[in-house]
């Protein structure tokens, strides 16, 4: 591609130089003609009458142009052919392109119509174009050499031509000529068979209609008979069903009575039925663990001081249940011989409120230390006094 571009550039430069030389020669000749009025008259004073046809005018102009060029010794830049004649008639002229090559453009023909004389003075644009300087080539147009005139595709006609319809490769296999096209059904044996079946279906449809009528009549008779029998059966069954609800009502009353007996309250035995509580208070219970000797919380609930209803029949006890599940968390008997030292009021820390009651008891042959925390000191003293009252008499009263 680069070599082709360079060749085209060289050709354009050479053609440009040749055209510049020719234009300079024509300038010199025109300057000479200005000094010779006889030559100017012979070159330009050709007049053509209006009655002549257009073809004669074109031929006359071409002849005059050739004579003037021969007399002056100037070679025409473009050979006059039949195409140039047509261009003159269509007011076209050749001009110089930016790439330095000759393109076919419109010939500028100055037609000055003189209304008084009624003729047309034709001056070829060849002389004017020769006098004009050549157009300068732009240094930035690198693709100027690829003009329409110098293009290898310039010979190809760009005239609007209707695109030819491409014949399909499957044209031979058209539906009319295809081996797979079905033959007409007119002459086929299938048509006769179809016609015969149609006649049979028509005759068969008539028989089916008659059978349908008979079956419908039979169905109506059966329906009437069955409906009468069913009505009689319903009457008999209705009389029997009237007596059944009475028996059902009796059974339902018995069942309701039995359910009432099942929902009766049941008594829960707690072991406190023969006891009465002389004092109760809400408290939180702590116990000393055997292994680590630290206080451990057992839970909170209501602490009761219970004594037997019949005094002297038994001993009292301290009973406490957990609020959540009512599990017994303290059940300490008050035996005879308990001293006051086993019940001591204390505080959790020095300077704090004395709202704890420490109780030292024996359970299952082991000594256990409890601590009951109440709201304030007054409740702790009341609890201690009631516990001392519940201890059976005959015990030691040590201070």
Curated annotation (Swiss-Prot):
Cellular compartment(s): Nucleus
Biased amino acid composition, Polar residues: 253-263
Gene field: hba1
Compositional bias ranges of the Basic and acidic residues kind: 1-31, 49-69, 101-130, 205-217, 241-252
Cellular-component GO terms for this entry: nucleoplasm; nucleus
Keyword terms: Nucleus, Phosphoprotein
Protein name per Swiss-Prot or TrEMBL: Brefeldin A resistance protein
Segments for region (Disordered): 1-173, 191-269
Principal location listed in the UniProt entry: nucleus
Taxon lineage: Eukaryota, Fungi, Dikarya, Ascomycota, Taphrinomycotina
PROSITE patterns linked to this entry: RANBD1
Record's comment on post-translational modification: Phosphorylated.
